[in-house]
Amino acid sequence: MNKQIHFTVIIPCFNAEATVQAAIDSVISQTYSHKDLIIVDGKSTDGTLAILKANEANISLIISEKDKGVYDAINKGIKAAEGNIIYVLGADDKLASDEILEHVALHFTPEISLVFGHIRNVHIQNKAVPEVHSSSFSNLLYLKNTLHQQGCFYRTSLFEKELFNPEYKIFGDYDLHLKWFIGKINTYKLDQTISICEAAGLSKQVKWDLYKEEIRMKKARLSTLLFLLNCVWVPLKFIRKKIFA
């Protein structure tokens, strides 16, 4: 066990009474002991808070207040984190096995800033969504987000200068992934499934407003040439998903 690695797992949630217990259980059951759990609730109106209260003994911090969206909630968790590694788990997702944190910790050598693996989608309604999302940290990031946040473990130090942009609805993680790729951070790919994820989320919706957000994000991050390429590529992605959805 790498005792120098301490994980802070952040679960952002809102009205997640049907799924949040499974997410919590998947963290509690991890065999790796150097971890803490922060749950950031957006002032839920269902039974979520009662579930969180019942799990207080296993939760380091519960924040329950209105937020500006999921990235605002995640940022609150990062600011409160005590661990040197950040992991974000969706309230309707769960870690794929009890040994995930143990496996990840083995590969966080001092020069590594990001360890990533694959995720598995469930409840797929859109055939364009792959069952297994295979991750990569490569030039493909210029065209699409080839890293899934629920498959990524970040050094807390990555967020010292910049947190997730809370103005983005779904591209806050892609935004920073691009920044870090351009900045050439050191990463390690773990060839295993990290989490099991609900595939029917916001990022799987085929709405032009979401694609416009991707274009806006890339305008701020990319060179002029790469941005112009994406001005063609992103609409083509939208049309393809509209046709095959």
Residue ranges and their predicted role:
Residues 86:
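Short aromatic/hydrophobic "clamp" motif used to bind/position activated sugar donors
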Residues 42, 89-91, 171:
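Active-site acidic Asp-centered loop
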Residues 130-213, 217:
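Conserved nucleotide-sugar donor-binding catalytic segment
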Residues 1-28:
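N-proximal low-complexity "stem/linker" segments adjacent to membrane-targeting elements
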Residues 33, 41-50:
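A conserved acidic beta->alpha catalytic loop
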